[in-house]
């Protein structure tokens, strides 16, 4: 049997397996256990009572976290004319059409979010094999294909997260950084849960939000007592 590392021993000594922690307890303990040389993210996993094999039970959308994610977000926008000026004014890092598509085909993909106006989809449609595998393909269901590109840019820069149930019916997303106040993290998670509940499929039966787990990038996952969340 492999020996536990010093970090693993510290986690084993302080984490009670199977316990449901209040949100504040979990955030505090995870921050205490963070002992790496970079600032870890706080991540949340939400197990939903859906059957992801059924297309009408796939939950996807986007949430603007009230306190952001703590990350600097690079945004590229496919649009032209007045939309291009509005996108740049809103803080877009790069705006273009065929020129931007050519750069991306050549390997310049240093962006976290790609947004497009509807009239630009004729250009973006050529980039499916480039953007799709990276999760960057604009999609109207998460607000990244929109005539109001300026608002989409502002939302992305403000800390909007996009989500979709995986094959097990679980939503995974980042909700902040170690160093965030617990209250700010909690507001972010509550905003996410509120949107998930709003998007509940009509065909979903039984308990919808089955489990909420909070973790850090390199840390353990702690089950959250949902009674400690206002959502």
Curated annotation (Swiss-Prot):
Family matches, as InterPro entries: Ribosom_uL1_bac-type (IPR005878), Ribosomal_uL1 (IPR002143), Ribosomal_uL1-like (IPR023674), Ribosomal_uL1/biogenesis (IPR028364), Ribosomal_uL1_3-a/b-sand (IPR016095), Ribosomal_uL1_CS (IPR023673)
- PROSITE patterns associated with the record: RIBOSOMAL_L1
Q: Does the keyword Hydrolase belong to this entry? A: no
- Keyword Phosphoprotein listed: no
Signal sequence residues: none
A Gene Ontology annotation in the biological process aspect, one of them, is: regulation of translation
Keyword terms of this UniProt record: Repressor, Ribonucleoprotein, Ribosomal protein, RNA-binding, rRNA-binding, Translation regulation, tRNA-binding
**What GO terms are given for molecular function?**
rRNA binding; structural constituent of ribosome; tRNA binding
Gene Ontology cellular component? cytosolic large ribosomal subunit
PANTHER family from the UniProt entry: 54S RIBOSOMAL PROTEIN L1, MITOCHONDRIAL, LARGE RIBOSOMAL SUBUNIT PROTEIN UL1M
What family, per the record? Belongs to the universal ribosomal protein uL1 family.
- HAMAP family hit by this protein: Ribosomal_uL1_B
Q: What does this protein do?
A: Binds directly to 23S rRNA. The L1 stalk is quite mobile in the ribosome, and is involved in E site tRNA release.
List, alphabetically, the NCBIfam families matched.
Answer: rplA_bact (TIGR01169)
Q: What does the subunit comment say?
A: Part of the 50S ribosomal subunit.
* Descriptive protein name: Large ribosomal subunit protein uL1
Q: What is the lineage of its organism?
A: Bacteria, Pseudomonadati, Pseudomonadota, Gammaproteobacteria, Pseudomonadales
Gene name, per UniProt, is rplA
């Amino acid at each position: 049997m492999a020996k536990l590392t010093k970090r693993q021993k510290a986690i084993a000594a302080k984490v009670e397996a199977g316990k449901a922690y209040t949100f504040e307890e979990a955030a505090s303990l995870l921050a205490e256990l963070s002992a790496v040389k970079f600032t870890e993210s706080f991540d949340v996993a939400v197990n939903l009572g859906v059957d992801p094999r059924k297309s009408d039970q796939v939950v996807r959308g986007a949430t603007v976290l009230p306190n952001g994610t703590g990350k600097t977000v690079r945004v590229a926008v496919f649009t032209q004319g007045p939309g291009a000026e509005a996108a740049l004014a809103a803080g877009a890092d790069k705006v273009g059409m065929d020129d931007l598509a050519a750069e991306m085909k050549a390997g310049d993909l240093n962006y976290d979010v790609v947004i497009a106006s509807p009239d630009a989809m004729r250009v973006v449609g050529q980039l499916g094999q480039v953007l799709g595998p990276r999760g960057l393909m604009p999609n109207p269901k998460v607000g990244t294909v929109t005539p109001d590109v300026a608002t989409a840019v502002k939302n992305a820069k403000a800390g909007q997260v996009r989500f979709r149930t995986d094959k097990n019916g679980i939503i995974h997303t980042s909700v902040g950084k170690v160093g965030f106040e617990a209250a700010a993290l909690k507001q972010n998670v509550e905003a996410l849960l509120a949107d998930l509940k709003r998007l509940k499929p009509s065909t979903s039966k039984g308990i919808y939000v089955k489990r909420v787990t909070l973790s850090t990038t390199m840390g353990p996952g702690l089950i959250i007592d949902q009674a400690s969340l206002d959502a």
